[in-house]
Amino acid sequence: MNNTLMKEMLSRYGKLTLSGIHTFIPNKEPKEYLYDLMHDYPDRGGKGFRPGLCIATCKAFGGSVKDAEFSAITLELLHNAFLIHDDVEDESFNRRNKPTMHQLTNKAIAINVGDAMNALGLYPLFQNKYRLGEKLSEIIFLEIQNLVTESTEGQAMELGWRLENRIDLTEADYFRMILKKTCWYTCMHPIRIGALIGTKGYIDKKKFNRLGYFMGAAFQIQDDVLNLVANEEEYGKEIGGDILEGKRTLMLIHLMENCTPKEKLFLQNYLSFPILERKQDAAKYILELMHRYNSIEEAKNTSKFLAGAALKEFYTHFSQLPASEDKDFLENIILYMINRNY
């Protein structure tokens, strides 16, 4: 794995996208509790996977950075809007080594900022028609529309499980949920959009679905693993937060399927409490159970298997393309998704 190339290109495309985001955020009132806050999460320095995947795929298929720029900006605006809303919904305390927006302000202001960023994401899409033409721009718009729909449906599934305190979930339920919540907006649509732009619409976008799904699932599972075992400073969020929030991760589902009836009853009782009433000692005990039943190791193995499947799909659809640093970047980012520490 070429870490140097991958990090350099993520940084390059991330900076380009961030610069574009700043140009689209209005410089007018009300600044203090809206427009200035819209710079906050993007400026904290995320990984930049989504714009990186979009731009690199576009270039690998013969397009240019300029062709993909507006779509990449939209993807990152929507991503940060989702993060603001997710932090409110999960009652999270930290994001990228800083207090979450609703902790810095309040929930009402954070929700409003997220709403405004979602709306702002439409503006770059409108600009696409001047570079890509109306027909292709409309196709890209529909891709974004489906991205938002799939993501919110997946989030609804997960929030509903927590509300109903579901303890009967299977791994198949989990994979259906992350397909919607994570895979479409993290990998499937960024790759599809990049390929559509790079080929000027002359490609079957559906052939990238398996690649994006395997990549997105590997990414999400690794993210869930890191929430339990990562260095908090590197990870940027509170370690073990997913247990406190009651998220139905692959590890929690594996644990519930393999633990004793007494331990399962303990889990059910723990998850029935409101988030702020859940005790750290109980969360630590659940983490110990996950280690005892090899739930974390099983999740790591699943993530590696999915990354291997993603690589096979990548070679199927990208091997015929000319050699380029963007093509190399896309191959390396699949490996990075399961080897990363943050």
Q: What spans do the regions from the language model cover?
A:
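Surface-exposed helix-capping loop/turn segments at secondary-structure junctions
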Residues: 131, 315-324
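Mg2+-dependent prenyl diphosphate-binding active-site environment of isoprenoid biosynthetic enzymes
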Residues: 25-265, 275, 335
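Hydrophobic, well-ordered secondary-structure elements that form the walls
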Residues: 252, 310, 330
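Mobile late-domain/C-terminal helix-loop "cap" segments
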Residues: 265-317
